Amino acid sequence: MKELQEILSSSQHILPEWILLLGILLIVIIVSFQKKDSKWPYRFSFLLVLIYTFSATYFYENLPAGGLKLYGGLLLVDQTSLFFKQLVAISTIVFLIHCRLFDYKFDGEIYFLMLCILLGLSFLSMTTHFLVIYVALELVSISSYVLVATKNEKMNFEAAIKYLIFGATSSAIMLYGISLFYGMGHTLNFAEPAFIQAIAANTPLIIQIISFLFLAGLLFKIAAAPFHSWVPDVYEVTSTPIISFLSFAPKAVGVLVVARVVQSNFADLNAVLLLIIFLSLIIGNLAALWQTNLKRMLGYSGIAQAGFILIGVLKSPQTDFYGAFFYILTYLPITMGAFLLADLLKNLSGSDEMEDFKGLGQQNIFLGLNAVIIMMALVGLPPTVGFMAKLMVFSSIVNLGEAMHSSVYYGLLIFGLLNAAISIYYYLKVPYFMLIKKSYNQPKYNNDFFLTLVLTYFSISLVIFFLYPDFGTEWVRKVLF
């Protein structure tokens, strides 16, 4: 009877997820009875995500300081999980707007899968329980595999198979790590004191190796090295609004789970994270240098961006993950703007190849300026909010070096600055081709004023948040652990 009361009591506190789950069941019915080209799945999905966003925002207004532990510790609802749920919901809304702007005629199954990913990420953001992490991650992963394969083309099937193979491998490695942790700690909740005490009896090296195994599934979703091989092919062939969503939402929540693992302090994971950061930065940046396809370049740069974000997750006596969370907040408009730009450029040129963008910025100067601002934000140059994000991450390295009295972190600072400098070359290739290079025998392009205007809103927001960062910084400070 006591267990039943616990379940009923806990269920009252996840109303947004119940709304989302009910909506997912309803959209299955809508898709089953509507024509293939019906707009009702899109309209219903948009309304459902709006309701979910508002309910997730206002339902948890009076959360206690330590959050709410639900279902006997399976779930943890706190300000941090709420922050990430809001970011993922906003990215879903941007995905739906992106589909509308560029007149993507997706089948209803696409929206069903997208809502499943949203539900999985929602649960993933509010747990410290190994079992919930694994199940939620599998819901996200399986839905993602199907999304990539939705285009009935050979390249999409090949990319989806590669995505599936790497995903299944990383999930198996992760499950093996979880089983080892369960054998050592005799519980599946890594935030419980009993688990931390039991783990402490083992040698640090063994714990670090097992932690790396557990992190495999999360690193796969974050698109961090060495679990990154699926990225370029999937980014190239997947529809732009879908990959725009997948490039942000799983990465953001994956970083949150890594931060929760670091914050629980059952092991010193800095050595493991440093290896991942170094690999992600060097592989992502060097591979991006040689790309001629914009979406493949954004894929490789996303690997490097994962490395920069993980810098903010490194553990120190003063760790609060402020740099990582602020970076993720700014990464939302930057990455969504970048993929909107990519889609608009493809519409105008008929290709994702950067050489085909020659002269587009000369014909439409506002489009060229938007490209400059968005690419500067990805590099981390002023006057864009990307500069603030990079600055806070690099500041956290300096503080870490002072607190830990280790030159390794100062080496990481130099390495990070060098990689940021390298990224200037491949990011600014886009405005270079648009504004500097001239195209001979150039066809007449139909410049879409409305789409350029929407893109301009993203660009202006990147500059405004640089000039007035208080909104973002205060929001992040409220949700720190």
Task: Outline where the language-model segments fall.
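Alpha-helical transmembrane segments of multi-pass membrane proteins predominantly involved
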Residues: 1-481
